Design a protein with these regions (language model features):
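Short, Lys/Arg-enriched, disordered terminal segments
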Residues: 1-4, 247-249
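ABC family nucleotide-binding domain
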Residues: 4-219
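Conserved beta-strand-loop-alpha-helix hinge in the C-terminal portion
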Residues: 223-249
Length: 249
């Protein structure tokens, strides 16, 4: 059975004017991402990965080339059209969680559904609860953001990304603010989502993350320099189990 293409970039270029100088941030990027893949996009500072993230997230459009998200051409869309598409098709997860402070987990997770007139308040609430249970926070439904650890807040952010049942989960340095143990706990969750058939793109500067994904794309100077399938995916659960437990009181 032919795999569904969720994301397709065709010779995408993005140029910016900085003063009198034109900067070529993306220089003809092309690739396809298929349903159910867990892809890391890596690159050092200045590689173009942040610009690419903005393209993938429909926050910006190419100077030339085509970006097709779940069958929808993005480049010629208006800003408002892209906002609607983004809310329906993409679940964002950020390094700094982007949660509303002093707001409960359920209320934070409900947010992406607030603008969907097809979803009733009761359904919105239930879907938020289901998403939080799916990330292991069934006992933290009504805790506020300022009452939770960094790992718990990132789980809320992941639940918020899942609640719309998006075509793709787009994570930007999603373990960047977490300690080693908590980072592995979040990677375990990403691997579980991948095993359940979710399409995940994880943008990072940390090459170790690539060990836990199914495919790795490397950027340098605005170009794809490698795009490889990972035939030896490491288990984040095993990595977590190998971390010594701190027994200090």
């Amino acid at each position: 059975m032919k795999k569904k293409v969720v994301i397709e970039l065709q010779n995408v270029r993005r140029n910016f004017m900085v003063g009198d100088e034109e900067v070529h941030a993306l220089r003809g990027v092309s690739f396809k991402i298929y349903e159910g893949e867990f892809v890391t996009i890596m690159g050092k500072s200045g590689s173009g990965k942040s610009t690419l993230l903005n393209q993938l997230g429909c926050l910006d459009t190419p100077s030339s080339g085509e970006y097709i998200l779940d069958g929808v051409p993005v480049r010629t869309m208006s800003k408002s059209q892209r906002a609607v598409l983004r809310n329906r098709k993409i679940g964002f997860i950020f390094q700094n969680y982007n949660l509303l402070s002093k707001t409960t987990s359920v209320e934070n997770v409900e947010l992406p559904l607030m603008y969907n007139s097809e979803v009733s308040a009761a359904e919105r609430h239930q879907r938020a609860i289901d998403a939080l249970k799916a990330v292991g926070l069934g006992d933290r439904l009504y805790h506020k953001s300022n009452q939770m650890s960094g790992g718990q807040m990132q789980r809320v952010a992941i639940a918020r990304a899942l609640v719309n049942n998006p075509a793709v989960i787009l994570a930007d340095e999603a373990t960047g603010n977490l300690d080693t143990r908590t980072s592995f706990e979040i990677l375990v969750l990403f691997q579980k989502l991948h095993a359940a058939g979710r399409t995940i793109i994880f943008v990072t500067h940390n090459p170790d993350i690539a060990n836990y994904s199914s495919r790795n794309i490397m950027l340098r100077d605005g170009k794809v320099i490698s795009d490889e399938i990972n035939n030896n995916i490491q288990s984040a659960a095993e990595g977590l189990a190998a971390i010594p437990v701190n027994t200090d009181e």
